[in-house]
Amino acid sequence: MTERKAAAPRGPYGAWFCLLVALALEVVRVSSNHDTLDPIYLPVALELLDAPEHFRVQQVGHYPPANSSLASRSETFLLMQPWPRAQPLLRASYPPFATQQVVPPRVTEPHRRPVPWDVRAVSVEAAVTPAEPYARVLFHLKGQDWPPGPGSLPCARLHATHPAGTAHRACRFQPSLGACVVELQFPSHWFSQSATTRAELAYTLEPAGEGPGGCGLGTEEEPREQALPVGGVELHPEDPPQYQEVPLDEAVTLRAPDVPMRPGQLFTATLLLRHNFTASLLTLRIKVKKGLQVIAARPAQPTLWTAKLDRFKGSKHHTSLITCHRAGPAGPDSSPLELSEFLWVDFAVENSTGGGVAVTRPVTWQLEYPGQAPEAEKDKMVWEILVSERDIRALIPLAKAEELVNTAPLTGVPQRIPVRLVTVDSGGALEEVTEHIGCESANTQVLQVSEACDAVFVAGQESRGAKGVRVDFWWRRLRASLKLTVWAPLLPLRIELTDTTLEQIRGWRVPGSAEGQLEPETAAEEVERRSRGCRLQYQRAGVRFLVPFAAHPLDGGRRLTHLLGPDWLLDVSHLVAAHAHVQDPRIASLEGGRILVGREPGVTSIEVRSPLSDAILGEQALAVTDDKVSVLDLRVQPVMGISLSLSRGMSHPGEVTATCWAQSALPAPKQEVALSLWLSFSDHTLAPAELYDRNDLGLSVSAEEPSAVLPAEEQGAQLGVVVSGVGAEGLPLHVALHPPEPCRRGRHRVPLASGTAWLGLPPLPTPVPALPSSPVRTSPFTEATVEGKRQIAGDMGGHVGIRGKFERAEEEAGKEENEAKEEEEDEEEMVPAPQRVTDLELGMYALLGIFCLAILIFLVNGVVFVLRYQRKEPPDSATDPASPQPHNWVWLGTNQEELSRQLDRCSSSGPPKGEGGCPCESGAGGDASTVAPSASESPAGSSSTLARKEAGGRRKRVEFVTFAPAPPTQPPEEPVGAPAVQSILVAGEEDIRWVCEDMGLKDPEELRNYMERIRGSS
């Protein structure tokens, strides 16, 4: 039992040991995953010019792209309006170098051929007949406005391909609408006498020429393979009827043409009569407004009916009364319900129709029978005739774009697409419609339309996007639809930080605010004040605001269509930077919406709030800690020029990818070189020097040859030098990073880090045996070191100091001695930035720490065990005279025979009456020295045995055994059946009173006899 108790405390420590081992393995795994540093790229500025609406895009988790390096950078742009008025340019700049290129034309389906214009082609007719053998196609230029002159607009040539041959015709875009119509007549031999055939339409764009209409004559050869498709047109053998039938009553039906009428045109309306009509007299009253008149009424069957026309002119209406009499009975073989023509009414349209605008002319028809009221309203029917000077064939809406990116929820600024309605006439004439227009959006949760029907827009309240959302337009009896694609942002925003934990940079202090301080009187006080005004420098991080855009299905499904793809995000930093802020500006601040600056330790977040409401569009937590990191090295890339390459993407017509890289040609004499700097920190993060304020960067450059380099003009955060000449082996430039000049005191005069850049090709490395304890990494671009007390000339705030690396003047040597003394007097010594710890070293350190902790836990467990059981010794022998103190042992038992025997002894030998009471009650009546000897008088061991009756009738026996230092003079004789216990009662009478009372011995004589028996047995 003792062994189990001792082993029990080891259980929790074993569990903790297993947990720590698992934690060590996890540390090794995480360190292996953290092997690669943050991605690095050439911090060249890329911007699009003359592109009003564009976005930077990136793939999820791929910024910068994989092909970026210290000497190159790639960026992808999305142009939502790829054909602006001016040709868009992409400019790349890294002072003092800059270059630009024209964005290549858009690549269109299906042949992936670049075209310079975004053209929408709409086929007006779906079918043609020999009576109207004309196929009309409207071409419209989308995108931004174009120059007002017609010289820059191209021609569109329509090609028709039929099994019987080909035909083509061209039109030139007009500057007013940016549209034109091609009316192509099909040859008569293309039409079949019995079957319907099909002709395929396609178009090509060509520069304007000197032919009719400004376009070339073209050739009769087959259309080129690069032609873009328009659609197909069916060629019917005969002209289908175009009329409508309206019943005037149960027996008479009106059949009228369903086409617009032109001024001066004649047309005929026909009345049909059922064969079961039995009346012999029929009167037809026709009322027309001015501009339309009835000129004749002719019976279709003169042998059955006669017709008489009477005309009456009024101030507003002209009334014509036609009286029809039956001349003979109907044929016996005709069906009773069959309709047959019985009256033809001829109409004429007057020449004046109101300036060429289409108008409607109402015609009221009323049938009268004998015995019927002449003005019965129930028999009146109004039929409207559309009259126009133009032969209008279609109503077509023209939109600047067919795709809209809804950024209104992010900016609060509505997005609009202008829309213009035009009519297409026979002959190819176009005319804009501006009045009496109706419009309606089929889904207001996606897209809305203005009251004037001149634009579609999104205002920020829309909840979703969609592809092919429809907007309906109507004018008079003509209707048209416009389908667009709306991309909506999928909130919340993704706020991407290059580093979410900003730490204090060891040894780097920058000037702080000195407000409220008095001007110093001497130069020494100025230096002291400036040194006291320096504050800690924390890391900085770049910020990007990203969001995916998607279109929802119109049928209410959940499958989304993403812009560019599900793994592409749009950079909306230029849109939401004004609405972004740090929740606690004391901890960090956001400079320009793009750079996060740490201020003091704490935890906060970056929030972007909606400009339309108080809702949070996106949030990202960040922390600023007082943990210190070191600048391990500087990664330096010399830039002697930049090159740019542009390419079109395949995911979207407006996708453009720009790749820029630094030129590494050998520098010519007086060649200006810019140095791109990246700071590598001990927390495995990288940051370009452009993130930091140029006044906080103390940079210096040194060369082996004093006259090799000269300082260049300031170019912002970049470091520039002028190279006077270089040998064939290349020229190394050593760049060092210092704190600003006002904060260089003592240890802060030592460079924080340094790096080496090779101009041209670096020399071949000399094989040198490397020490095992100091591995050296080489790179073709940088050779980074952390310098100790190397003397490098430099100025504050990005100014460049140039000196020879091995040039040492006497005054400089004295200055070095003075600076060394100042550093010795400084309390804090500059700690060189440690080299980067490898993953193997991290794992070994973690395992070593785990083993040390396990050994410590084992030692603590042993000490606790010893302290807990050092006083618990096994019982010594009763004859051991060396035992310094007694040991009390308790024995629990239920020996019923022993308890009964003791009770019988007490009851059989009671004390005589009149004797004294229980000896435990007083000291009289007994020999005190015999009953309770003291420890000094009786060194023998003593014991007492007590028995008490339990509630259930079962007695327990409790033995108290005391081992004395010396054994008794005589061993006791134990009764048969009783436990062999050597016991002597050593307590006083007052101490054992409870024993007497519990055994039922009330009489003093009985108690005295019981005590004597106990002494005798002992």
UniProtKB/Swiss-Prot annotation:
Compartments where found: Golgi apparatus membrane; Endoplasmic reticulum membrane
Keywords carried by this UniProt record: Endoplasmic reticulum, Glycoprotein, Golgi apparatus, Membrane, Signal, Transmembrane, Transmembrane helix
Compositional bias (Low complexity): 906-922, 932-944
Binds to HSPA5/GRP78: annotated span: 606-911
Region of interest called Disordered, as start-end residue ranges on this chain: 807-833, 900-956
Binding partners and assembly: Interacts with HSPA5/GRP78.
Identification of the protein by name: Transmembrane protein 132A
Organism listed in the record: Mus musculus (Mouse)
Gene name for this UniProt entry: Tmem132a
